[in-house]
Amino acid sequence: MDLTQVLPEKLLADVLRRVAPRGLAACRCACKALLGIIDARRLLRTDLLPHSVAGIFINFHSEGLPEFFARPSTGPTISGRFDYLPPHIGDSQYRGKIEDHCNGLLLLEDYFENYYVVNPATRQWNSLPPHPSMSKSGEIDADFTYQEYLIFDPTVSPHYQVLPPALDELDTVMEESEWPPSVCALHVFSSSSGRWEERSFIRDGEAADTIADMRRHFDKHYAVYCRGALYMHCITDFIMRFSLSNDKCQVIKPPIHGELGECPKLHLGQSEKGVYLASICEMSRLLVWVLDESCGQTNWVLKHNSCIPPILDYDRPILGPWVLQDINYEYLKERKDHTDTEDMKYLKEKKLQLNSSKEVLVEEKIEWDSQNDNILHKEDVVDAHGNGYFDILGFHPYKEIVFLDVSMYRGLAYHLKDSKVQDLGYLYPTTSHLAVLNEYFITESFPYTPC
């Protein structure tokens, strides 16, 4: 039934005002009449979308399941357990990692290279069909890192896309071939068609490097979907901008090397003013740049350059306003073959130490106040340089806040505008007490915004 022919436009608009943003996006795609009503009355306004950060999903190298670091909730719980996904072979539980996040959807990969797109807020999920060969020969060069990225904007469409790096047309035998090639041929997955489709992007401007310079680098490189384009952080720190409206790609050079100094790695993210890059140099100096694309030019503007104060007692197991769900510990505790082992007894002791302040914590307010909660004052920091090291977990997408961890023990929220530091809480997984030291590190982290 065509509701636009049955109901008066004003009445239909009143009905549509009660529809959630993602549902409105679906209505826009249903027919031109609904599209006209929604757009003419500005019913789908991005400023009315939820702008909250529900928590941070974290992949720890030593753990089989992602962890979720978040404020405890009295409502439906968002979890990193993903026990509704197909279980690991020989197990009762899904096991894998999070590859990407975009506007409330997660891209997951299990240990058999099966991919899933998941909405943790609704527990809805879809599996992706196998990816076509990334090379014409059907063989994949082991020296390249293949990461796939998610594209989703609920204000535009209920459908998502998955975009891999531009690798399909590379001749990896030709070490001096330019990277990226003049035509980037990709297989892009579209949820509207349910299949991988060939798509070519024409390079606008010069190449960034040669294939010889693009060999494997194990650090995670993130991507950002912003203003209708995907910004992909590539090896050697240049950014590739894929415009989905005109099928063009462009190389964006990183900040000049003089500014980078001894910065070990850059972290790409999205925040209040668009696309950001951040790096921590000399263990505690935080540098942040914002991408300026005005007047048809691209330029990195240095936004912040300041030292983060060392944190006092950063490794003490004391809970804060945010709590790690400790999914790997709960999973291990449920396994019958681990119930009475010495390792399990040891982990239970560690868990008891951490839970000593939990009852008081749950009684506090649930909504995180990004301005006032758990501000660290002078007595909470130390003067000595090097008391723990800092790493970047991601950006708050709507406020100029960088999420950090201190030696993987505590989470912090660092405000760029006034250098205010908030203690979020203890994020060390209980099961990591059993990990070999060189196996314990964070591989990926994603601030999560539900939709």
Predicted segment positions?
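N-terminal entry/capping and adjacent linker segments that precede and initiate structured domains
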Residues: 1-451
